């Protein structure tokens, strides 16, 4: 039985800031943002929206009345929670009028929350193949005015309906994973903005990717030729390319060009 993403949608606000305008305001070269980071626009969240409205708006675009009857679980992966106790998933569950006998909860783990939610959804559908799980990844990234992280800010939400025999994408059962306790990025209680060591965070990203790449080759007996494409989580646009280039030495030039 295949399990995976049957439907997917996303939502971002109507407001954005052009990165050239931000560069001019900060008296810096726009190419630092456009080329150095690969960022052209920054989504801006209005005061009337939060991760709940972003997530509900994304999900509303794909769910039918029949889906809402079949959903047993609503999971929100976020590090921009609106409450220390109340889950955003519970509010979204109500806004979307999903049948009441469903689990609704939130997963917080920096950049990993949405992926963890997908793994949880997969396992549930494997045990309950006639039921569905709604997974939402929603965040509002804020670093403060004139900080190093300012040009990497943004906001948005992705909604995914996880089912058996999906129309869009089926998950393989070959995941590999890695954990390390580092303080490159965190936001303690009482802080409005995260504490970030940008250079360290970049290096941790690359090092973690190369370690998990080697582990994947070892466990699943794969190499780059087994992949049509590689999808990255992106703190900013260029980060994925930097990580990919870290494994280029093991590939012929033709393979490098294909993947990049």
Where are these regions (language model features)?
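Condensing-enzyme catalytic core mediating Claisen C-C bond formation in acyl metabolism
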Residues: 1-48, 147-214, 219
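Acidic, glycine-rich active-site loops and adjacent beta-strand->loop/helix elements
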Residues: 9-11, 77-82, 109-114, 137-142, ...
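Short glycine-rich or small-residue beta-strand-to-loop segments that form or flank ligand, phosphate
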Residues: 72-80, 106, 230-231
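A conserved active-site cap/scaffold subdomain adjacent to cofactor or substrate pockets
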Residues: 200-217, 227-241, 248, 260
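Buried hydrophobic positions in well-ordered alpha/beta secondary-structure cores of metabolic enzymes
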Residues: 5-7, 33, 62, 74, ...
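Phosphate/pyrophosphate-binding loops at sites that engage ATP/ADP/AMP, CoA/4′-phosphopantetheine
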Residues: 58-72, 210-228, 247-252
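Flexible, glycine-rich active-site loops centered on histidine and acidic residues
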Residues: 126-159
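Conserved catalytic cysteine-centered active-site region
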Residues: 32-36, 40-53, 79-132, 246-260
